[in-house]
Amino acid sequence: MELVKICPEIGIVMDVDTGIVAEMRKDILVVDLNPIKEEINKLETLSKAFENSLDPRSAPLKAYDGRDNIYSVGGLFQSAFFGFWISLSILTLGLILVIGLYPKLIGL
């Protein structure tokens, strides 16, 4: 929304979008809401993508075609990764415990 001051002395302005000529009042603040609407639309798009990310069958917002089950595949790899490291650490702790309790097993 753009305003053109026709006569600043008496406060007459014209709205460029509609072509309406009117008197500008001192007690009313005119604010352009178009940039705010654009930011709200961006936030709505991002929130919709975040909501869709909770469904493992959906694709991410900026993904290539054919990436429909990417979240479920990522979940499988994440589970395998953490499962490997957790089981390796439990095995190492168990081995240290067995060696500590029975040092004759390794010849000490």
Swiss-Prot record:
Catalytic activity: 5-methyl-5,6,7,8-tetrahydromethanopterin + coenzyme M + 2 Na(+)(in) = 5,6,7,8-tetrahydromethanopterin + methyl-coenzyme M + 2 Na(+)(out)
Keyword annotations of the record: Cell membrane, Membrane, Methanogenesis, Methyltransferase, One-carbon metabolism, Transferase, Translocase, Transmembrane, Transmembrane helix
Subcellular location: Cell membrane
Membrane topology value: Single-pass membrane protein
Enzyme class, spelled out: translocase
Pfam families listed in its UniProt record: MtrB
Transmembrane domains' residue ranges: 81-101
Any one annotated GO CC term: plasma membrane
Gene Ontology molecular-function annotations: tetrahydromethanopterin S-methyltransferase activity
Protein EC: 7.2.1.4
NCBIfam families: methano_MtrB (TIGR04166), PRK00965.1 (NF002129)
Protein role: Part of a complex that catalyzes the formation of methyl-coenzyme M and tetrahydromethanopterin from coenzyme M and methyl-tetrahydromethanopterin. This is an energy-conserving, sodium-ion translocating step.
Family statement: Belongs to the MtrB family.
Protein name: Tetrahydromethanopterin S-methyltransferase subunit B
Gene: mtrB
